[in-house]
Amino acid sequence: MSTDKKKEEVPKPETEDLTVKDETKNKDKKKANEEEELSEEDQKLKGDLEMLVQTLLEDDSKLYETTLTQLKEFIKNSTSSMTAVPKPLKFLRPFYPDLCKAYDKWSDKDQKSSLADMLSVLAMTYSDTHQHDSLRFRLLSDTSNIASWGHEYVRHLALEIGEVYNEQVEKEAEDNSTSTESSPQPPHMNFEFSKDVILQLSLEIVPYFMKHNGEEDAVDLLLEIEAIEKLPQFVDENTYKRVCQYMIACVQLLPPPEDISFLQTAYSIYLSELQLPEALSLAIRLGNEDMIRSVFDATSDPIVHQQLAYILAAQRVPFEHPELQEIIGNTKLSEHFLYLAKELNLLTPKIPEDIYKSHLDSSKSVFSSAGLDSAQQNLAASFVNAFLNLGYCNDKMITDNDNWVYKTKGDGMTSAVASIGSIYQWNIDGLQQLDKYLYVDEPEVKAGGLLGIGIASAGVHHDVEPALLLLQEYINHSDTKISTAAILGIGIAFAGSKNDEVLGLLLPVVSNTENSLELAAIAALALSHVFVGTCNGDITTAVMDNFLERTPLELKSEWARFLALSLGLLYLGQGEHVDDVLETINAIEHPMTSAIEVLISSCAYTATGDVLLVQDLLHRLTPKAVKSSDEDEDEDNEELSQEDMNGISAFLGKKENEIAEEPQGNEGADNEMEVDSHQDETTTGENNVKKEENEEEKTEKSEKTENDEEEEDEEESKDEGANDELAYAVIGIALITMGEEIGKEMSLRHFGHLMHYGNEHIRRMVPLAMGLVSVADPQMKVFDTLTRFSHDPDLDVSMNSIFAMGLCGVGTNNARLAQLLRQLASYYSREQDALFITRLAQGLVHLGKGTMTMDIFNDAHVLNKVTLASLLTVLVGLISPSFILKHHQLFYMLNSGVRPKFIITLNEEGEQIKVNVRIGQAVETVGQAGKPKTITGWITQSTPVLLGHGERAELENDEYISYTNNIEGVVILKKNPNFQEEE
């Protein structure tokens, strides 16, 4: 019995008690909430609102108007703080469905309109996703005072407008693509939203945003409804700056054609507000000559015209204006640069040893350079000297020593003489220095003189064009060395000039397919530099004819890459015009077709950040399954090899496996010989039979040799085309992503993966792509990675990594990079090609003693097409480093893209003046409230000064007023009449 009692006394499970406890807790909470909600003030408010709603739900229509007015007052008075849902909206929420039904019953138009006005606000708190009731009732209401409901309501309305518009666009697309069968619509779609009505409402909302510091919201709304061109009418002098800054920042993130329409709208706003330098920057970015003309026509002030001309000159944009031709033609560039050099005390010439610093190299011994070609190292010194003293018009090595040229040999003499042109770059006096070399017997020396004339005249255009007069008579010279040097010189001198006279001279050279491929390729390359980004149809046709008419054997040459590049440069930054050319190329049946297509599309969409195109390029770079070569002999082995090749590791290890297989085969042969030694009779019989068979096979083979050779040629050209495609795809990723910072970061991450998993052709290009993404921007993480790559077992990868280090630090004098390159020079002291590239990289880092840059963008985010074209030419040459080392004159293509990174201030008379400026790191101020600082960590200096990558300058005080907001290059200032000096 006791046990039974104990059993009965066992407590019930705790879960039952918990549920009871939870219920009591919930009841207590509800009571507490009710008490909280129903405080005296709230209870009175709730009672008043319920009474007003009941009045609306009754049939007495006379009271509706006053009741609605009272309700609206309650709501409006509560919306002063939007930290939480306003009490009236909270209390009215349960009545929303009843009020909607009441709206349907009412007949009076004015009363319905007034109720719809209120329901539109209530719908903010009640409406389910995709109902769009707020917008629906707003359109049903005739009242136009949207602003009275406050900022939160207007933003909610703008959000719904965007959603509805996108739904309509999708619906129209579906209607066009699918059959006419009507699909069942959700209930909220029964109300037809008219595009015109939505646009009208949006144009009422935009002015509200503009008045209440919501410029970004206004731009976003007009973007959603595809009406960004309507924006200028709402912008005034107080809002234009923030609006345009936001729009230009958005361009990198927009797909075409919206990016173009944003730039055009920002241009028209700047033009209407007479912000002409900013308008000109956008016109250059769009590449529209009519827009540039409109900027000049917008003012008659000659000083403003001069400032605009200096901006055009810096970007190498040709423009016909008789009074400004000297400035646009860069004829004063040398004068300004030498003024900078004098003020910074840099006129004393340097020699290559000043940057080699061989005396610091402790590991250097008597035997370290044994076996090195001294002529090649002298040639390297010529290049370093040319880059180091570029534009200074004096040096200690070549100009005063005529014998230096003969310390090099063969084609090296051409580059040695041409380096004089680099020393005298932008200065007409350089032509006199080079003239004597045109009367020498050696064709290499004469060719160097011609190339030097082109380099000395790079980007400088006089009325007479002396460089063209001197070079044109050598274009059709019988000696290829002389003719190619003259053509290359013209390409460097007239890069970006769109000179029709040059077109008339060089187009016949490209069109004549009887010329050697080298001559045609160099002529096409020169023309593409002169007409970079112009989509010139005549040059395009001439280059395409070369691809169609030349033999596969000719197109195997590395020069064919420069034909492909010339097409890419013609369409640089012209994504909207490239489709026709790509279609034509696709129609050609040739192994190089796919590679050319990749290069052209990458050039056309440069700096657009096009994610889909980058994905396509990455897809091309992923390893494919590789077919086994002995598939006819053994099917089982073929299956196994294909399975292995599907993995990335096996793909990369293909060569190692082949090498490993060879010794096994030899061992097997030895074993067979041992067995055969025991069977002499059988072997002799077999050998006799084999001899007879071999004789028969030889006769058959001799008949098939021609066909086999043709097939092999086709296969080789296919492989070369595929390899070039991979190389162009890697460069393409860098080209497309170089426009904005996030894209750069992502591309650098991808390059790391490609270096790890890619084949030899991909790995060879990855360092160059990394260098291209960060030209003149020596980030520690980038050049440390490149330093690691510079010790790669593949010497081509190492050389390209070293050159990429030079690109990263071009013109920066970066001490860390200089030290790394000195270490590499010591490491590769026995490897002459790698040492040559290392010397070139050292020359680039110290370009113009640190006063020059090859930065592809300026502070206004304008792409410098001439600079990019010069870099791409050398990078394409470095696909095969041995090729460009043999044709080292191509390195001088870099000279056309070099420009000083100075700030020089002039007064209105054009005289140089000294003004204090602050120089610091540029700060992104887009979308920030108030007037934030545009630079940080600044240092005050007196002009002329140097401006590094990512730096920005501003005037220290108001003593002078600048004619341009972007303080870079040559800036014209005027005295501020209202300036008062501080005591």
From Swiss-Prot:
One record GO biological process: regulation of protein catabolic process
Short name of one Pfam family: PC_rep
PC repeats: 415-447, 448-484, 485-519, 520-557, 563-595, 768-799, 800-834
Annotated Acidic residues bias: 630-642, 706-718
Location of the region described as Disordered in the Swiss-Prot/TrEMBL record: 1-44, 169-188, 625-644, 662-724
Listed GO MF terms: enzyme regulator activity; protein-macromolecule adaptor activity
Role this protein plays: Acts as a regulatory subunit of the 26 proteasome which is involved in the ATP-dependent degradation of ubiquitinated proteins.
Family (UniProt): Belongs to the proteasome subunit S2 family.
Protein name per Swiss-Prot or TrEMBL: 26S proteasome regulatory subunit RPN1
Gene this chain is encoded by: RPN1
